[in-house]
Amino acid sequence: MKEITVTEPAFVTRFSCSGSACRDHCCKGWKITLDKTTVKKYLASKDTTIRTIAQDHIILLKKNNSHWGEIKLPSALGNCPYLDEDRLCRVQKTLGAKALSHTCSSFPRAHHTYKNEVRNSLSLACPEVTSRILNDPDAMALSEKTIIQQTFNTAPLFPAQQKLLNLFCLSLINHANSSTEAALYALIKFVMYAQKFAKIDDAALGELEQVYAALLEQLQTGVLAQELMNIAPDSKVKTSLVLQMQDYFRSLPLNRGSVILDHYIQCLLRVLTAEEGVSMEQKVSDIESSLARCLQANEQQKNWAFRNLILYKIWENNFPNQPNVDPLRALYIIVAEYAFIKLLTAASVHERGRIEWDDVTNIVYSFHSRSQHNSEVAKNFHRHIETVRTGDDLSMIHLLT
C-alpha cells in the first residue's frame, strides 16, 4: 500500500455548488463534451425525456472515447437542454449524479496529480468559487491529509525543490500586509534571482532561502512598498493593456460570461474617454485613486481579497514551475491579469462611488470564464498578452505602480 499526500486550500474543502441559486450557472454558453459511455447511456435511457433530448441535442463526433459527442445548445448563450425550469439538471435528478458526464461531474474541480501527491483546486470561472476566494480571509489556507491506495499514481514525482519554490512564492504574497503590489514586486525580485541558477539544487535553495528572508523583512518593514512608490509610473503600459484586452475579448464569440465581462469593459472604456482634453493615462490615475480611497475605507477586506486572488494564481499554476514556460513570462501574465481586473474594478468604483464586492466577483469569474475555461482558451489568451509585453518582462513593474 502507498501513501498519497492530498493538499488543498480551504476554499476547496468548503466549496459546495450553489445550484439553482447560482448567479451564472455553468450549464449554458460553452461547449459541453460527452464521453462515449455517457452518450450511449443517454441514448438508451429508459426515461423518455432523457432519451428524447439525447436524440435531438447530442451531436455525435466520435473524436475519441472522452470526446464522443457534444450537447447542441439552442444559441451561443443558450441553456443545456437537460436544464429544467428550476435551473437544475434533469439527468442528476432522474438518473443520479453518477450518470453525469465527466465534464459535468468535474467542473469546477481540478486535480493536479503527481506520483505520490495530489493538489486539489477549483476554477475561478465558477462564481461561487470566486466569491469564496474574495470574501473568506482564510480561503487560501492550505491543509494536508494522507490517503492510502494500492499503488502510486501513474504521474511524475513532484520534486521537493519545486514544492519549496512554490511555497516561497506563496509565503511572500501571504505576508503582503495591505500591499499586494509590493508583494508582487518582491516576487519579481525573487524570480529574477532564482533565474541566475542553471539548476535549482540544494545549494541554490540555500541561497534562495536567504533572499526570501531578506525580501520578507523588506516587505514587512515597508521598504519594498516605498521602493515601488519611488519608481516613476508609466501609465501608457496600463492603457496599452486596456486596449489590447478589450480588443481580445471583443474578438471572441459569445459564450458564458461574455455579457457580464463586456458590461465592465464598457464601463472602463466609458470612464477613460468621458472627458475631452483629459488623457487616458490621467483617467487611469484618477480611477485608481478612487479605488484606493474606497479600499482604505474597507480596510479589512482589502487586506485579503486581492491577495487571495494572487495566492490562487500561484497555487493553481504551481508557479514558478510551469513546464516550458519562463518564470518571468509566467509572472508577467499573473501581473497583467491582476492589473486588468483591478482597472475594471476601479472603473466600477469610480462610477458607483463605492466598492461592491459583488461587482468584483462578477469581474473575476467572467474574466476567467472568457479567458481560461480550458487549456486551449487559456493558451490563446496568453498568446494575446504577449502583444502587451512587447518583449520586456520587466515592464510588468509599471503595471504595479
From Swiss-Prot:
One of its GO terms (molecular function) is methyltransferase activity. Coiled coil: none annotated. Post-translationally modifies flagellin by methylation of epsilon amino group of surface-exposed lysine residues. The keyword Transferase applies. It is an enzyme of class 2 (transferase). This is Lysine-N-methylase. Keywords: Methyltransferase, Transferase. The keyword Cytoplasm does not apply. NCBIfam families: Lys_methyl_FliB (NF038110). GO terms for biological process: methylation. Its EC number is 2.1.1.-. It comes from the Bacteria. Belongs to the FliB family.
